[in-house]
Amino acid sequence: MRKKYFALKSLRHLGFALFFGLTVQAQTYTSWKVGSTTDVTTTTTGGICLMGGGTDNDDAIKWMFQKAGGGDVVVLRSAGTDGYNTYMYSELGVPVNSVETIIIDTRAKASIAAIATKIRNAEALFIAGGDQATYVSYWKDTPVEDAINYLINTKKVPVGGTSAGCAILGQYYYSAANSSVTSAQALANPYA
């Protein structure tokens, strides 16, 4: 009887370890989602929404979401919280299926296939403010960069960003990786 008890206890521990191990392995990044957990595919119209920072412009984000056709919105950032989720999902008056904020704070996380898939499945992408140097150093030449370019060039969904998120959306960008520059310096030698 004692042998049977230990066998059952061992199986229970093994089952717990497997379940816990799979749970821990299931998501190795931070994200928050509001709205439907079911992915939808909607008809979208491409567009770029560039905002300089500070207070978000409701009309600009509404314009972006109207182009998303009621689909899923992904918000990318390298630090912070889910501050955009409720605002974008329920305070703008433009229905979307869901809003998910994903924190990508390392190059390793920018290589997670599940994150790239979530980005590729989005009908709108918004890149929050922060530090554009971290966006460049974490995302450049990774599946996240490929997924963002796929949304813009192939799927043609609306993409927007504010502050640092705006700064990295062009073909040429100011990364602020090595130092900063004043307006007077930049205007005196814009091609340096």
PLM regions: where:
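Bacterial Sec-dependent N-terminal signal peptides
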Residues: 1-28
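Surface-exposed charge patches in extracellular/virion surface proteins
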Residues: 2, 120, 155-156
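Generic detector of bulky aromatic hydrophobic side chains
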Residues: 6, 26, 74-76, 101-103, ...
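Polar helix-capping/helix-linker motif
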Residues: 7-8, 111-112, 141-142
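Intrinsically disordered, low-complexity coil segments
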Residues: 12, 93, 153-156
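Extended, subdomain-level signal for the structured scaffold at the beginning of enzyme domains
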Residues: 27-134
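Class I SAM-dependent methyltransferase SAM-binding "motif I" and its flanking Rossmann-like core
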Residues: 45, 136-192
